[in-house]
From Swiss-Prot:
Protein keywords: Aminoacyl-tRNA synthetase, ATP-binding, Cytoplasm, Ligase, Magnesium, Metal-binding, Nucleotide-binding, Protein biosynthesis
Cofactor field: Mg(2+)
Cross-referenced PANTHER family: PHENYLALANINE--TRNA LIGASE ALPHA SUBUNIT (PTHR11538:SF40), PHENYLALANYL-TRNA SYNTHETASE (PTHR11538)
Main location: cytoplasm
NCBIfam families: pheS, PRK04172.1
GO biological process, one term: phenylalanyl-tRNA aminoacylation
Binding site for L-phenylalanine: T311, F389
Catalytic activity line of the entry: tRNA(Phe) + L-phenylalanine + ATP = L-phenylalanyl-tRNA(Phe) + AMP + diphosphate + H(+)
Keyword presence, Ligase: yes
Assembly information from the UniProt record: Tetramer of two alpha and two beta subunits.
A GO molecular function held by the record: tRNA binding
Family classification: Belongs to the class-II aminoacyl-tRNA synthetase family. Phe-tRNA synthetase alpha subunit type 2 subfamily.
Protein name: Phenylalanine--tRNA ligase alpha subunit
Length: 465
C-alpha cells in the first residue's frame, strides 16, 4: 500500500528511471527533507535503490536575502528615489525608513552619491547593483561565485550549506493507485467498495496529543474537598491572611508567653490591629489571668501576624456567639520554616467547627470518619491526643495502601475557656487537617513544592481527579 507522496515520487521516476533527490523535489513539489524519508521507505520496500550518495555545498538565500530579492537592495532603492536630483536626508529617511542607513552607507561606499550639508547629491541617475542581479540569478537556480558571493555572504543575504544528494533508480514498477481512506455511502450502495484498496488503520496507535486547558490539579483537589464538606451539611467561611494575635492565639487559650508567638514561629507584621467588643476582650483576659496566672496585655493582643493556623477563622466564627453551626474553612497559613520536599513557609489547612446543643465527642468521631471515608479512606482509627484548646483531644489516622497508618488530623471538643468567653455554651467540636499533606498522599506527590508548580509540561502530565 502506497501513500500519496510515495505515488508522486514513483510517477516521477517512471518517466526518468533514474534521478537525483533534488530533481525529485523540484519535479514533485515536495520538500527535500520529505523526499529523503520517502526514498528510504521505498527502498525498504524494494521498489527503488539509492545508487550513490554525496554531500555538496550549495548557496541558499537567507530570510533577509529573500526579502531583498523581492524589494530590492537599499542602495538601489535610494538611487531610484533620487532619480538624478538632489534630495534632503530627511526626505530619504522618511521614504526608506530603517533601510535608509543601510542604503546610504552602501551608496556612499560604492561612489553612487555625495553629501553636501544635509543634501544627498546623486552621481548616477539609475543603478542596479551586481549583488541584486546575483540574488535574482540565485532565485532562478544560478549560484553566485567570486567577489559577488563574498559580498553577499558578508551582508548575510546568502548562506552556504552542506546538502546531501541521492541518486535514485527505479527497480520495478508498481501500481500507483492511491489507497482510499473512507468508505462512502455510494460505495456501499453500489458495491463498488470491492474494487478499491483501503488504507489500513492502526487501532493500537496513540491518538494525537491535544494540550487542552484544565484546572490545576491541586486546586481541583481542594475543590473536591470543599464539595464533600458542603455535601455533609457544612457552610464555608473564610478569613484574612493578616490577623491579630487576639484571634490567632488569645481566643484559643494560648498564653502570651507561649513559644509559638516568638518571631521564629510566626511572621510578625508591623503595626497594630483592632480588637472586638470590650466585653469579649475582658472575658478572654479574665480566663487567661485566672488559669495561666499572668498579667494579660491588651497591647500584645493587638499585634499583627500572618495567621499561623486557620483556627483563627474558627475563633472569628466563635466571636459571633452562634447557637448552632456546621462550618469549615480551607485557606493558606504561614509559618517560618526551612523549605524542602515536605516543608513550606505557606501551605493550606482545613478547619472544621460544629456547635450543637447535644453534640458529643462520639458525634465528633463519627463526623471525622464520614469526612475521611468521603475522601476515599476506608479504614480510620483514633488515638488520644493533646491540643491546647480542645479537651478531650484525638489524633485521626487513616490507612493508605503502601504507606500503612498515616496521621490525618487533630481534633477535639473545644475547651470551655475558649467557648464561654465568646458566649457559646453548647458543646463545640473542632478539627484541623493539613490539606497539602493530605493532597500529597492522595495524589502521589513526593515533593510538596510540586503542588504549586507552574511548569506546563509537568501540569499536563498530571491527571485531574
Amino acid at each position: 500500500m502506497l501513500s500519496e507522496n510515495e505515488i508522486k515520487i514513483l510517477d516521477f521516476l517512471k518517466r526518468r528511471k533514474e534521478s537525483t533527490s533534488q530533481e525529485i523535489a523540484e519535479g514533485t513539489g515536495l520538500p527535500l527533507s520529505s523526499v529523503f524519508s520517502i526514498i528510504a521507505t521505498l527502498e525498504s520496500k524494494g521498489i527503488v535503490k539509492v545508487i550513490s550518495e554525496e554531500t555538496r555545498k550549495v548557496v541558499r538565500l537567507t530570510d533577509e536575502g529573500k526579502l531583498r530579492t523581492e524589494q530590492g537592495l537599499p542602495e538601489d532603492r535610494l538611487v531610484t528615489l533620487l532619480n538624478g536630483r538632489p534630495l534632503k536626508i530627511q526626505e530619504l529617511r522618511n521614504a526608506l525608513g530603517k533601510d535608509f542607513e543601510i542604503g546610504f552607507g552602501w551608496a556612499r561606499r560604492k561612489g553612487l552619491i555625495t553629501l553636501e550639508n544635509d543634501t544627498v547629491i546623486p552621481k548616477v541617475s539609475q543603478y542596479v547593483s551586481p549583488e541584486y542581479t546575483a540574488l535574482k540569478d540565485l532565485q532562478a537556480g544560478k549560484e553566485p561565485t567570486g567577489e559577488v558571493l563574498e559580498i553577499l555572504l558578508r551582508r548575510k543575504l546568502v548562506e552556504v550549506k552542506e546538502e546531501k544528494m541521492l541518486r535514485v533508480q527505479l527497480l520495478r514498477e508498481v501500481e500507483t493507485r492511491p489507497a482510499e481512506l473512507y468508505v462512502t455511502h455510494e460505495m456501499l450502495t453500489t458495491g463498488s467498495w470491492r474494487e478499491y484498496e483501503f488504507k489500513p488503520y492502526n487501532v493500537e496507535a496513540n491518538p494525537p496529543f491535544f494540550p487542552i486547558g484544565k484546572t490545576h490539579y491541586f486546586r481541583d483537589f481542594i475543590e473536591k474537598v470543599k464539595d464533600l464538606m458542603v455535601g455533609l451539611g457544612f457552610v464555608e467561611v473564610s478569613g484574612d491572611f493578616v490577623e491579630t494575635e487576639f484571634f490567632n492565639f488569645d481566643m484559643l487559650f494560648q498564653p502570651q508567653d507561649h513559644p509559638a508567638r516568638e518571631i521564629h514561629d510566626s511572621f510578625v507584621i508591623e503595626g497594630k490591629g483592632n480588637l472586638p467588643g470590650s466585653d469579649l476582650v475582658r472575658k478572654v483576659k479574665e480566663v487567661h489571668e485566672k488559669w495561666w496566672r499572668y498579667s494579660w496585655s491588651e497591647d500584645n493582643a493587638r499585634r499583627l501576624v500572618l495567621r499561623s493556623q486557620t483556627t483563627a477563622v474558627t475563633a472569628r466564627v466563635l466571636s459571633g456567639a452562634p447557637k448552632r453551626i456546621r462550618a469549615f474553612t480551607i485557606g493558606k497559613v504561614f509559618r517560618p520554616d526551612s523549605i524542602d520536599a515536605t516543608h513550606l513557609i505557606e501551605f493550606h489547612q482545613m478547619d472544621g467547627l460544629v456547635i450543637e446543643e447535644d453534640f458529643t465527642f462520639r458525634d465528633l468521631l463519627s463526623t471525622l470518619r464520614d469526612i475521611f471515608q468521603g475522601l476515599g479512606v476506608k479504614q480510620v482509627k483514633f488515638k488520644p491526643g493533646y491540643f491546647p484548646f480542645t479537651e478531650p483531644s484525638v489524633e485521626v489516622y487513616g490507612f493508605i495502601e503502601g504507606l500503612g497508618w498515616v496521621e490525618m488530623a487533630g481534633a477535639g471538643l473545644l475547651r470551655k475557656e475558649v467557648t464561654e468567653p465568646a458566649g457559646v455554651f453548647s458543646p463545640a467540636g473542632a478539627w484541623g487537617i493539613g490539606i497539602d499533606r493530605l493532597a500529597m498522599l492522595f495524589l502521589g506527590v513526593k515533593d510538596i513544592r510540586d503542588l504549586y508548580s507552574l511548569d506546563i509540561e509537568y501540569l499536563r502530565s498530571r491527571r485531574v481527579i
